[in-house]
Amino acid sequence: MSRLPSLSRPCLAIACSALLGGCVAAGDVRPFAEMAPIVPVVAPVAQPTAGAIYAAGPGLNLYGDRRARDVGDLLTVNLVESTTASSTANTSISKKDATTMAAPTLLGAPLTVGGLNVLENSTSGDRSFAGKGNTAQSNRMQGSVTVTVMQRLPNGNLVIQGQKNLRLTQGDELVQVQGIVRAADIAPDNTVPSSKVADARIAYGGRGAIAQSNAMGWLSRFFNSRLSPY
């Protein structure tokens, strides 16, 4: 059995690393948190009362609105989010060292070899480091997601949860919304702005060719990680 040349072994290792990196990049760029499945709420069947005109149970309120208030009701969240962040960091470090050792003497006379003070020594060092970092990010989100009321708290607030999954030509787009809504903030058309959602968890991203083109490769991620020596 012939052995591989010494030069081909590093090339083979690099090729295997590239293939593994391609396999990793083929997965989801940014996985989403798994939401609990929305279980439909079955309303209890009211037992008819003999001899009564009105029966207990859910009915249509002629003088009320159709805002979400109970578990299982639907509510539309209008996404109006805009964030801007920037950060700048500069670091500069320098250090200099100098040490001189005088030549020893014997009976007041220096020890020399051929007229030179061979035992005289001096050392010096100079180290410096400079680093600079700049980050800027701006995000804007507009749209709407219809969510489901998952729980009604004792104070009347509603725990909501929902997501929207769009299957596009070049991939998938997913929007997830979770949070707590105050019943008084729900508009008459059964909508609420995302700025009124407490403990809001809004996730937006995608899977597919478009999302892959916006992600760094495995080698770039290595040089930007803590494992990079540079």
Curated annotation (Swiss-Prot):
Assembles around the rod to form the L-ring and probably protects the motor/basal body from shearing forces during rotation. A lipid is attached at residue 16 (N-palmitoyl cysteine). GO terms for molecular function: cytoskeletal motor activity. It is a lipid-anchor. This is Flagellar L-ring protein. One of its GO terms (cellular component) is cell outer membrane. The basal body constitutes a major portion of the flagellar organelle and consists of four rings (L,P,S, and M) mounted on a central rod.
